[in-house]
């Protein structure tokens, strides 16, 4: 079992490393400058994190945070920023046609030479691999960038699934977290694709940078597990300390989910879309639809917040704080009269005195 944990930890981090290297390779290909290979040095952080995790945690994760996912985002974010800031949309159709022509021409050549290389299996494999790499390099830039965005989100979900469970998270909580990640990834992907594909946006580097800042900010929720690990059972001592403590203790996970929607995802996304529509006059039916969707989600979260506040208020009203008993000091012994005995134990029966004669006290002997 320990070996399986170590294997899953290594395989997941290797997947992160390979994907970030592919992104760096694409940046160097687009920019045509080898100095961008220096971005690969960021992967040393992932190597360091792997060594520390294997040494101190035996491959298992941490509580409330996944350092591997955080370092992976640090590695790949600069490459995606450079690709998004590089303007190459106008060459997409030309490059796609050229790639299709080269692919068909190369396929005809391979069919002609296949009969002459029937016995050389390794040569065919190398030729196919070389042709595959050449075809990938000819794919137009927007398609490459979109593919990197899509694979990034898929690898985040699969990687979080494969990473060994650590801390206090359970399998049930992990499955709930992964389902949340799927919905979050879909929202983030449509935000980047729908906003950055507009020509009015692409021609404004400041606006592109602002959208990428919001996108980067929204990606920071993936390394956190607070939405499922903050489901606590409040002890009795907390329930006697006031409304705010009870509210924060009972609904900490719900409050974290509401905060994510307001300040990390739906709130910033709505602000960006409103700025595009009102200030920059970028209006289309998809942008309007997703703006309404973000508004509706935030309204529902606000409705839930009000419902949680009312539920806590009803709980405090039904469970009032009981008065604390007064403890007497060591030098002041407590004294109580008969009236206090009757109040303390109403079901107790009072003792009645009955006269006992001397004859009834002791049995007589014959």
From Swiss-Prot:
It is a multi-pass membrane protein. It holds the Pfam family Tmem26. Residues 319-329 have a biased composition (Basic and acidic residues). Residues 319-366 are annotated as: Disordered. It comes from the Eukaryota. It is found in: Membrane. The chain crosses the membrane at residues 4-24, 36-56, 64-84, 138-158, 176-196, 208-228, 258-278, 282-302. Glycans are attached at residue 110. Keywords: Glycoprotein, Membrane, Transmembrane, Transmembrane helix. InterPro entries: Transmembrane_26. Coiled coil: none annotated. Residues 354-366 have a biased composition (Polar residues). GO terms for cellular component: membrane. PANTHER family: TMEM26 PROTEIN, TRANSMEMBRANE PROTEIN 26. This is Transmembrane protein 26. It comes from Mus musculus.
